[in-house]
Swiss-Prot record:
Role of this protein: With S4 and S12 plays an important role in translational accuracy. Located at the back of the 30S subunit body where it stabilizes the conformation of the head with respect to the body.
SUPFAM superfamilies in the cross-refs: dsRNA-binding domain-like (SSF54768), Ribosomal protein S5 domain 2-like (SSF54211)
Entry annotated with the keyword Ribosomal protein: yes
Gene for this chain: rpsE
PROSITE patterns membership: RIBOSOMAL_S5, S5_DSRBD
Family of the protein in this entry: Belongs to the universal ribosomal protein uS5 family.
Keywords: Ribonucleoprotein, Ribosomal protein, RNA-binding, rRNA-binding
A cellular-component GO term for this protein: cytosolic small ribosomal subunit
GO biological process, one term: translation
Descriptive protein name: Small ribosomal subunit protein uS5
């Protein structure tokens, strides 16, 4: 949904845990030889509905991860999490990657692969069914997953936007 503001400002009272999604060694060839550097995709979350992602590039792996964490802390968004799952089905596309996220019953676990799993676990979702289609590029998968999560709305948010009670959302 365009125009919806669910961004979160980073403060010291939010305790964020970081997860490394992917690391890539990049080689620049010059006439003097090869120069190696590293890029790292990092996801940070508080496991209570706040998530962010970042990309760090540096000459050393640890420096790239640290830059990625700092970048992720600047891109935080709030996501509705209901009883350990998502409120409704949602799909999103970024580049060639398309993701489908569906709520699951308690005890199912996180049924998702690779980059999607890191994002879903960092946001605090414990039961979900997720599928990726198209590109398996971790950059695009992370962005598409966060896009799908940030488009989700729970009943309270819908009622607030419409100016009605939560009961009226379900009864019509």
């Amino acid at each position: 949904m365009a125009g919806v503001n669910n961004r979160v400002k980073v403060t010291n009272d939010i305790e964020l845990k970081d997860r490394l999604v992917a690391i890539n060694r990049v080689t620049k060839v010059t006439k003097g030889g090869r120069t190696f550097s590293f890029s790292a995709i990092v996801v940070v979350g508080n496991e209570e509905g706040i998530i962010g992602w970042g990309l760090g590039k540096a000459g050393e792996v640890t420096a790239a991860i640290a830059k990625g964490v700092e970048s992720a802390k600047k891109n935080l968004v709030k996501v509705p999490v209901l009883k350990g799952t998502v409120p409704h089905e949602q799909s999103a596309k970024f580049g060639g990657a398309e993701v489908f996220i569906k709520p699951a019953s308690h005890g199912t676990g996180v049924v998702a692969g690779g980059a999607m799993r890191a994002v879903l676990e960092s946001v605090g979702i414990t039961d979900v069914l997720a599928k990726s289609k198209g590109s398996s590029n971790p950059h695009n998968l992370v962005k598409a997953t966060i896009e799908a999560l940030s488009e989700m709305r729970d009943a309270r948010m819908i009622a607030q936007n419409r100016g009605i009670s939560v009961e009226k959302v379900f009864r019509g």
